[in-house]
Amino acid sequence: MVFERTLIDLIKGIRSHANDEEAFIATCLLECRKEATSQDADLKSEAILKLAYLEMLGVDISWASFQIVEVMSSSKILQKQKGYLAAVQSFKPDTDVLMLTTNLLKKDLMSSKVPEITLAIDGLSHFSTLGLARDLYRDVLILLNHSVPYVRKRTILLLYRLCLQYPEAISACIPKLRERLDDPDTSVVNAAVSVICELARRAPKNYLEFAPDLFHLLTTSSNNWMLIKLIKLFASLTPYEPRLVKKLIPSLTDIIENTHAMSLLYECINTIVSGNMLVGHSQCDKLASLCASKLRGFFEDTDQNLKYIALLCLRKLANTHPSLVSAQLDIILKCLVDTDTSIRLRALDLVNEIVNKENIRTIVKTLMLQLIVSSDESAVEDIRNSTATRIIEMTSKSTYMNIADFEWLLTVYVDLANIPGIDTGTLLNNQIIDLCVRVKALRPFSVDIFSQAILDPSYVSTTDCSVSEKRTDILPAIIWCLGEYAEFIEEYLDILDALTRPSFKKCSNLAHRLLLQAITKIFCQWCLEEEPTWGVEKFGLVKLWVEKIVSFIEQFLNFQDMEIQRRASEFYILFNQVSDIVNTSDTMEVLELQKKPPYIVQNTMYKLFFGEPLNPVAVKAQRKVMPDENLDLNCPINGVIEVPKELLENIIQSDDSLINFDTEVPSSGIDTFSKKQFNSLESVPVQRDLSSPFYLSSNQHTTTTNSEPENLNVETSMSDEAFNADKVTKVTKNKRRRKIFTSPSLQAMVVAQDEVPEGISLADIENKENPSNSNVYSLISLDPPLSTNQGSMGDIVLETKSPIRVEKKKSKKKKKKKEKTSGKE
C-alpha cells in the first residue's frame, strides 16, 4: 500500500467491502502486523488502535500483546491512551505480558499528571490479576489521599476490584475506607459507601464497626441514592447486632413518612419487613400498619413494577402481621385477575399465606372465575395449572383448618375438574379421596354427587376432546369413592349399569384398576342390602347381574396393563365362584335352605372388602417403626445359591429321563386315573384352607343349612356411633327399601388425623427435628367429640384435644325418614 490507513479509513473500507468483508479485514490485518513492528511510535500507536477496533469484530490480536505494552509505556498521553484501550479489550488473566506491566502501572499511578493516573486506574480495574493486586494495592492506597476528588473516587472503586482479587488486602483497606466516609466531597463518600456495601454482602459481621459513621450519614444525608445504599447495608448488619433495630426505627419511620421517592420508600419498607424489625418492641404494630398503608399506594400507581415489588413486600409482611395484609384483600384480588402474568403469580403466592376461614370463599371464587374466563382466551397452560394447584393447596392447608363447609369444598373440587384446559388430575384425585377418607360425615353427600356424575353418559366421553377442551380426569377418585362407600348408594343397579357401560373402555389405566374393584364392592353391598326382601325375584336379578359382570370383566383378561390383567383375573374367578353357586337347577330348594344371599357374598366377599375401616396414615409413620436389631436390610435374602456339582448332574439326568418317559409311556396310561377320581382329589381342601376367610368353598351354601346364621355385625369405633342405628326397615314391594341412619347432618363433621404405629407419637420426632415447637399441640385430634364443645351452626371448634367439627344443616329427607322410623318403632 502506498499510504497507511487511519482508523477512519479502516471503518470506511469495511463498510464499502460488504460483499468480501473477510478478505478486506485479512488484508488490513497484514498491514497492521507490519505497522505494529515499525519504529515510528505514531504509526505503531495507530496500528494498535486499528487492532483494538478489529478485536471488537472478533479478530484475535493476542499476538500483539507485547506491542500493546510498548505503546502503553509511551510518554505521550495520546499514544498511552491508545495502548491502555487495546490492553483493556485484549488482555486476559492468562496473558503472558501482564507481568511486564507491574512497574509500568506503578510509574503511572505515582505520576504527577492526573490523566496518566486515571488511565492506570482504569486499566488495572479491567485486567488486574492476583499478582497485580498483591503487588500494587499499597500504591493504590496512597492515592486515597490525593488532592483531586476525582482520583480519590476512582481509587476507592479500584480497591473493590483489588480486594476481590486479593482478599488479604481487605484488612489494610478498611481503615482507609472508613476515613473516606468523612471526605468533604460527596462523590467520594458515595463511592466509599458503595464499596463498603458491596464488601459487607460477603461478610457483614466484619463491618459492624462502620455502624456509627454510617448511621450519621443516614440521618444527615439528603442524597436518595446514598440513603438506599445505607439502608441496604443496615439490613445486612441488623441480624448480627439486634440493638441496631431500636436505633434505626425512628430514622426509617421518618423517611417513610416524608419521602416521595418510591425507590427509597420501597427500600425502607423492605428493610423493615426483611430485617426482623416488626417484632420485639412496642412500636412494631404501628410501624407494620404504616408499611401496609404505604404499600397500598404502590398499587394505585400505573407502574406495574411497583405492584410487583409491593406484592413481594406484602408477602414478607404476612409472616408477622397477616391480619394487616388480609385487610388489603381487595387490591390483592384485583392483582389475581391482572393481565400481567408475573403479578398474578405473585398474588397467588400471597393469598396462599393470608387465607383464613373468613376470606377463603372470596379468594376461591375469584380464582375460579379467573380460570373460567381465561379458558376462552389463549392463556398460558402453566399459569392455569398453577392457579388450580394453589386452590387445592390453600383449601387443604393444615388438614383443612380453614374449611367450615366440607360440602362446599367438595363441590369446588368437582367444579375445578370441569373447567377445561387444566391438568391437575393426580393432585385433584388424591385430594378428593383424602377429603372423603378424613371427613366421615361427608361421605353420603360425596356419593350422592358422584352418583349423579357417573350416571351422566357424557361424563366419561371426554377423552377424545382437544387439549384446550379436555377436562381434568377425576374418574379414579369418583369410582374409588363409590366402591369404598357403597353403603350410601341409593340406586345400586343404576350405578352398576353405568359402571359397566362400553364407554368406560376409553378410561385411563388407573380408572380401569379401580373400576373392577368398585363393581365388586357395589355388587356385594347391594346383595347385603337386599337380604330382608330376598326372594325369587331378587335371586333372579343376582343371577343376571353376575352374568353381566362376568362378561364385563372378561374383556380385561387380556389387557396390556399387567395390574389390570391381574385384578381382572382375580375378580373373574371370584364371580365365577358366585355364578356356580347361584346357577343351580333347583332354585326354590336353594331359597328354602338359605333365605338370604349366597354365603360367599354375605361372608367371604364382605370380609374381603369391608372388614376393616380405611383410615389416613401419616406420611412419616413408616420411618418411625424401628427395624429389628437382627435384621440386616443390606444383606440379600437368599444370597448366592451354589448348586453342588453332584446335585446338578442328578437334575440333568432326571430331565433326560422325563424326556424319555414322555416318548415311551403309551397314551392308554393316561386313562388309568379317571377324571372323576381326579376331581374328587382336587376338591379335598387342606385343613388350613377351611379356617381361612378367603377360602371359597363350592358347597358353602349346603354346609350352612343346619347352622345358625352368622353374625355379620362389625364392631364400630366411637367415631362411627352416628351410623349405628337400625339400618333396615320393612318395606312393601312397591316401595323401594332405603337404609335409615341416624342423620349425620345432626353430628359434627370430624376431620380424621393421620394414623401412626402403636406406641409411637408424631410429636416425638417433631420435637427432635424442631425443638422450638416442642410445646405446640396439634389443633386436630382423633379423640371423640365432646358434647360440651358443640358449637353453633358453621362454627369450627378449635381445642387442643378436640377434633375440628362443623355443624351441618338438617336434611329434610333424612328428617322425614327418621320420623317414619320412630313411628314404626
Curated annotation (Swiss-Prot):
Against Gene3D superfamilies, the record matches this protein to: Leucine-rich Repeat Variant
Which Pfam families does the protein's record reference? Adaptin_N
GO CC, sorted alphabetically, is: AP-3 adaptor complex; clathrin-coated vesicle membrane; endosome membrane; Golgi apparatus; nucleus
Keywords for this protein: Cytoplasmic vesicle, Golgi apparatus, Membrane, Protein transport, Repeat, Transport
Tell where it localizes: Golgi apparatus; Cytoplasmic vesicle, Clathrin-coated vesicle membrane
Q: Where are the HEAT repeats?
A: 131-168, 169-205, 207-243, 244-281, 285-323, 324-360, 363-400, 469-513, 515-547, 548-584
Its GO biological process annotations read: Golgi to vacuole transport; protein targeting to vacuole
Basic residues composition-biased segments: 807-819
Stretch list, region Disordered: 787-825
InterPro entries in the record: AP3_complex_dsu, ARM-like, ARM-type_fold, Clathrin/coatomer_adapt-like_N
Membrane topology, as annotated, equals: Peripheral membrane protein
Would you identify the family this protein belongs to, as annotated?
A: Belongs to the adaptor complexes large subunit family.
The record describes its quaternary structure and partners as: Adaptor protein complex 3 (AP-3) is a heterotetramer composed of 2 large adaptins (apl5 and apl6), a medium adaptin (apm3) and a small adaptin (aps3).
Its function? Answer: Part of the AP-3 complex, an adaptor-related complex which is not clathrin-associated. The complex is associated with the Golgi region as well as more peripheral structures. It facilitates the budding of vesicles from the Golgi membrane and may be directly involved in trafficking to the vacuole.
> What is the name attached to this protein's record?
AP-3 complex subunit delta
This protein's species is: Schizosaccharomyces pombe (strain 972 / ATCC 24843)
The lineage is: Eukaryota, Fungi, Dikarya, Ascomycota, Taphrinomycotina
